[in-house]
């Protein structure tokens, strides 16, 4: 009897019948087998109908195949009495030995697999440690690179600030030098103007004094005391003019005291010479000739003036 027909007889589904057969075979009980369409199939007997009905009822009560079989075995060994009356269907010692050997092989295989799994876990753990070390090294390198970049940026900023301050100081020093140069040039031009004014004043004073001396000598010959008096008055007028010119030059720059003193001394000498010429015509004529000769030599050979040093000459001590 095949599974489909047997399921109809016991009023169970084919799936339930196959499940019961599976649990029976797992517990070492073997049912009759036959060949159907080239495949092995269970050959159910009439006596199997009652057994399957009891098992189905017990499964409904316990809602579990395992619990149902356990309770049935505790109640009575009905499986061996009803189904397994034939010793041929009972498991033999040879089958038990084979099962033990199979179990031993499975256990050995499991141990080997467990050992391999342990090695793999160790390798994975080691690789994780190496990865952590690499990550730490990368992190430290990144930190060091960041610090070096910050240091470089700080040094660049410091260099830029130093360059800016240096350029500012250089510009200020250049401006100061230019201002000082302009000031020195102005001072030199003023000094040259003052020196020129003093020189012209001295020349005018000498020329006028000499001309006064010459005129005095000539007029003394003609008019005697009257001409001498007029010459003295002219010399006094020239002296006042020279004094006014000296005062004007003092307002623009520092007056050369030596030049003014020389002018006054020359005027005084001219006045004294005019007085002497009034008393003695001969001596006045000789004196006038000598003075005219001296004045011509002085005018032909002007006194060299000391060259004033400019700003850059004084800067480099030239």
From Swiss-Prot:
Coiled coil as UniProt keyword: yes
Coiled-coil residues: 67-157
Location of the region described as Disordered in the Swiss-Prot/TrEMBL record: 172-318
Skewed-composition ranges (Polar residues): 237-248
Keyword field: Coiled coil
Compositionally skewed regions (Basic and acidic residues) per UniProt: 175-193, 219-236, 249-274, 300-310
Protein name (Swiss-Prot/TrEMBL): Uncharacterized protein SAV0385
Organism: Staphylococcus aureus (strain Mu50 / ATCC 700699)
Lineage: Bacteria, Bacillati, Bacillota, Bacilli, Bacillales
């Amino acid at each position: 009897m095949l599974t489909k027909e047997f399921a109809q007889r016991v009023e169970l589904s084919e799936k339930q019948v196959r499940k019961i057969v599976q649990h029976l075979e797992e517990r070492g009980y073997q049912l009759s087998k036959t060949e159907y369409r080239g495949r092995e199939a269970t050959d159910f007997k009439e006596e199997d109908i009652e057994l399957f009905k009891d098992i189905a009822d017990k499964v409904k009560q316990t809602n579990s195949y395992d619990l149902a079989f356990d309770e049935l075995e505790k109640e009575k060994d009905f499986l061996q009495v009803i189904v397994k009356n034939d010793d041929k269907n009972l498991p033999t010692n040879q089958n038990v030995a084979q099962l033990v050997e199979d179990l031993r092989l499975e256990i050995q295989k499991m141990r080997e697999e467990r050992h391999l799994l342990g090695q793999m876990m160790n390798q994975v753990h080691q690789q994780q440690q190496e990865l952590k070390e690499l990550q730490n090294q990368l992190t430290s390198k990144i930190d060091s690179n960041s610090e070096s970049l910050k240091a470089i940026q700080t040094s660049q900023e410091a260099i830029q600030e130093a360059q800016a301050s240096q350029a500012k100081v250089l510009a200020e020093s250049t401006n100061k030098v230019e201002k000082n140069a302009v000031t020195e040039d102005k001072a030199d031009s003023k000094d040259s103007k003052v020196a020129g004014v003093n020189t012209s004043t001295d020349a005018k004073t000498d020329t006028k004094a000499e001309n006064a001396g010459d005129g005095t000598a000539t007029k003394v010959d003609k008019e005697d005391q009257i001409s001498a008096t007029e010459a003295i008055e002219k010399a006094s007028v020239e002296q006042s003019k020279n004094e006014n010119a000296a005062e004007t030059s003092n307002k623009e720059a520092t007056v050369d005291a030596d030049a003014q003193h020389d002018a006054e001394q020359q005027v005084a000498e001219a006045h004294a010479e005019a007085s002497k010429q009034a008393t003695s015509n001969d001596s006045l004529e000789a004196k006038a000739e000598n003075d005219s000769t001296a004045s011509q030599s002085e005018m032909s050979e002007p006194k060299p003036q000391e060259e004033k040093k400019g700003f850059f000459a004084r800067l480099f001590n030239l």
